[in-house]
Regions:
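Central hydrophobic cores of alpha-helical transmembrane segments in multi-pass inner-membrane proteins
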Residues: 63-79
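Hydrophobic alpha-helical membrane-insertion segments
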Residues: 89-104, 176-191
């Protein structure tokens, strides 16, 4: 709640010393500037679903809409005056943030037989590729979707880091971001394997039972792996955006 309460526009968000650092950081992204490409992507997904009859196309469009919500909430928090309102929006933002990096796991839907090796009569081998255009279209939609969604997630994490208390040392700021990445890893596990949604937090008893019942070495390692991957993507994003 304390972090969300400080989430405001860049200028009043930090004192002059921190503002100097932010000039080297990531420039704010307006939803209006990115809604066009995302709408084109969603339309392509829906078109794929209609042409092929594959409901995965509609699912990708829906997932992209969910991935955009954290950025929308981030901008809403900057305009929200009451601290209680910013705190509530911040909590919803945290619950929805895993939806961004979740789309990376949609890559499991890549068609299995895109490339194979075939033995020829003369004893040599040849590499064959799928001649089905729908499979290549799906591969493109999955890759572009994962890329767009990961960028949205990294921008949301950048907004979080930029509005942490300016007095915090760099290790503390990175630890806070890493903690959020860990929560994202947990959210991705809940969504991909247990099929929970962000709003299932309204049923905490059922959620807790499912989580405890599925606890294993695999789930712990998966969450840790996703958290490290998200944190690595974010650090690369920050480095490239300077």
């Amino acid at each position: 709640m304390a972090l969300a309460a400080r989430w405001e526009a860049h200028a009043p968000c930090a004192p002059p010393q921190a503002h100097k650092t932010q000039k080297r950081g990531v420039k704010a992204i307006s939803v209006k500037k990115i809604i066009g490409p995302l709408a084109v992507y969603a339309a392509a997904c829906v078109g794929y679903g209609r042409c092929t009859g594959d409901v995965l196309g509609y699912g990708l469009a829906w997932n992209m809409a969910l991935a955009l919500l954290p950025l929308v909430l981030q901008q809403a928090m900057r305009r929200c005056r009451p601290r209680a309102g910013r705190g509530a929006l911040g909590l919803v933002w945290l619950l929805l943030l895993p939806n961004t990096f979740y789309m990376v796991t949609d890559l499991i839907h890549v068609p299995p037989q895109m490339e194979w090796v075939e033995a020829l009569a003369d004893g040599t081998v040849a590499v064959r590729h799928s001649a089905l255009l729908r499979e290549w279209a799906l591969l493109l939609l999955l890759g572009v979707g994962a890329f767009f969604a990961a960028l949205l997630g990294c921008r949301a994490l950048a907004g979080l880091e930029e509005c942490l208390p300016a007095a915090w040392p760099a290790p503390a700021r990175q630890a806070a971001v890493a903690g959020v990445c860990l929560l994202c890893g947990i959210g991705i596990y809940l969504g991909r394997f247990l099929r929970f949604n962000s709003w299932d937090v309204l049923h905490p008893v059922q959620l807790a039972r499912s989580v405890l019942g599925s606890a294993s070495a695999f789930s712990a390692l998966f969450v840790l792996m996703m958290a490290l991957g998200i944190f690595g993507m974010y650090r690369f994003y920050r480095h490239m955006a300077r």
